[in-house]
């Protein structure tokens, strides 16, 4: 049932920045951009507009702060994403319990694990009636808001569903635990 989740254009930009910053100095320069474009056979004409858009201090480099400011992102969240992606590349992330199935997710495996296991714990400690499941949804929203910043949406359901939604970069998940499906995503707080 799990499918490869297509990243949004914003998520692709963030991943590109993190990949271009191979030396992890939180700065990319024109040479690094050229190498990246050559590696992926991208149009070299993209380089100057990228530098013009993000290089606010005109030093021909794009810092992580300039990049985040240009997209309205929080530097701390991009750093966290970078650390979690590195753990994934190194194979250092926890495995989900066998009775949890990821349907779709744009977030790191670490976040997936934390969220899914907490949901499982909440569900396992209830009678699984309507009121208890409403409380699980409330607890999940509170946990997500407090752990990953506001404003999260949480939907719990059984059965089929179709949806289309917008979310903050790398902050959406859809998963199944037993007969429950949990949908969670963070929307902009401003």
Swiss-Prot record:
Keyword line: Calcium, Metal-binding, Repeat
GO biological process, one term: microtubule-based process
Single GO MF descriptor: calcium ion binding
Recorded GO CC terms: dynein complex
Coiled coil regions, renumbered to chain: none
Binding site for Ca(2+): 55, 57, 59, 61, 66
Disulfide bridges in this chain: none
Expression across tissues: Adult and schistosomula tegument.
EF-hand domain: residues covered: 8-43, 51-77
Protein name as annotated: Tegument antigen
Classification of source organism: Eukaryota, Metazoa, Spiralia, Lophotrochozoa, Platyhelminthes
